[in-house]
Amino acid sequence: MQQGDGTEAQVTWEDQQNINRFGRLNNRFHELTDEIRLAKEANENLEDAGNELILCDEDVVRFQIGEVFAHMPMDDVEARLEQMKEDAAKKLERLEEEKESILAQMAELKKILYGKFKDAINLEED
C-alpha cells in the first residue's frame, strides 16, 4: 500500500486482525440497526394494541398466541400485553446499548488504523 509520502505501509498480522474485527463490527452494526427498527415497530404495535384494548368494551377478547387466536378475559390480556411491552422495551434498550458499544469499538479501531495507514485505507461508508 502506498502512503501519502511515497513509502509502503507494511500490513502486520495485528493490523489485519484489526481490519477484520472492524469489518465484523460493521456487519453487526448494520444487523443491529435492522433489529432496532423491527423492535421499535413491535413496540408501536403493542402500544396500538393496548390503545385498542382500552376502547374495547367486551369482557372476553381474542388474543393471538403464536398462530392461533384464543378467547381470554380482558384482565388477562391487559396483564399479558403489559408484560410484552416491558419485555419489548428491555430488548430495545439492550440493542441500543450494544449498538453504542459497537460504535465506540469501531471509533477506536478507526483511530488505530487511520493512525497507521492514513489515506491508504478507507473505513467510511459511502
UniProtKB/Swiss-Prot annotation:
InterPro entries, per database record: PFD_beta-like (IPR002777), PFDN4 (IPR016661), Prefoldin (IPR009053)
Annotated Pfam families: Prefoldin_2 (PF01920)
Molecular function terms, GO-annotated: unfolded protein binding
Keywords, in A-Z order: Chaperone
GO cellular component, one term: prefoldin complex
Gene3D superfamilies documented for this protein: 1.10.287.370
Signal peptide positions on this chain: none
BP GO annotations: protein folding; response to cold
PANTHER family: PREFOLDIN SUBUNIT 4
Function: Binds specifically to cytosolic chaperonin (c-CPN) and transfers target proteins to it. Binds to nascent polypeptide chain and promotes folding in an environment in which there are many competing pathways for nonnative proteins.
Assembly: Heterohexamer of two PFD-alpha type and four PFD-beta type subunits.
Family under the similarity heading: Belongs to the prefoldin subunit beta family.
Name the UniProt record assigns to this protein: Probable prefoldin subunit 4
Gene encoding the protein: VIP3
